[in-house]
Amino acid sequence: MADRELTQPDRQLLAAVARLAGVDRVRVMDETLHGESRSTFAVAAGDDEFVVKLVPGAQRAINNQRRLVRLVRELRRRGYPAPEYVGVGESGGTIFTVQRRLPGQTLHAGPGMPPAPELFAAVLPSLLAAIELQRDAGDLAQPPWPAWLLRTIETGGDGYCLHATMRQAPRTAALLDRLQTLARRSRRDEVTTRDVVHFDMNPANILHAGGRLTGVVDWNIPFDGAGQGDRGFDVATLLFYTYDIEQTREALWERALELSGLAWTTVYLCHLSLRQVEWSRRHSPSSADDARFMAIAEAVLHDCAAQGA
């Protein structure tokens, strides 16, 4: 699920972006996009601003991104604060999407840092209401959820959730063993599969203006069948990434349990613990980011067990 690393866009790609956006030409904006993956860049055409996201893969990637555009358009029709997608394009083997840029700034204070507690508390009610609009918005009769999610816990993922990273140190190895044990005994009860799932609903992908929610960005369907499952996973994601904000922790726990129950909320938090701890340990070992997410993961797993998981 690793994103394509962005290099300087070439003229051919920019011309294709302009055609898709219905303008004569676009210029690359000289800024780093916060709240989007490293495979994105912003362009301007007159007074209009767009976000271009590069997507790895070939024809199948095009089909998945077209499906993404359909899903997000349906969410917007329901009133969801998602970006307006102009469409999906291809240039020289590069697949890309173009969306209109939403106003606002990201919730997080910086990479790996939590949002200000008062700010997050102000935005949270609107964010939970938005997630509720994902209910029954999926388009697949038999989505692969949660089988692929469970595989990340058992064997690892494609470019993320790497178990080899976790086995390199006693503390992370113990965390992996613990979350696997918790997840295995929590794989019970019926699971929701009909909702749209963002899958990375962390503060870096949430926009606000003065404490008012303005958008949820960085939508993606990286493989066949992704983007559909249990919307409670997105609530669990918010819970994990803001676990050190006491002001909102209880409300997020309550909503996660209402949607998914303790068993599946535990499975989701086990995956999130693995995903973020492994990523931080591999990319920024011994950093404040690494330390913060390790502490959150240990606290999350402790609290899951304390509730009876």
Identify the residue ranges that each predicted region occupies.
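An alpha-helical support segment within catalytic cores of ATP-dependent transferases
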Residues: 6-24, 132-199, 293, 297-301, ...
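ATP-binding pocket architecture of kinase catalytic cores
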Residues: 30-141
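Anionic group-transfer/hydrolysis microenvironments
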Residues: 55, 102, 202, 220, ...
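Active-site Asp-x-Gly
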Residues: 194-196, 207-252
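Active-site activation/catalytic loop segments of kinase-like enzymes and analogous catalytic loops
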Residues: 231-261, 270-288, 298-299
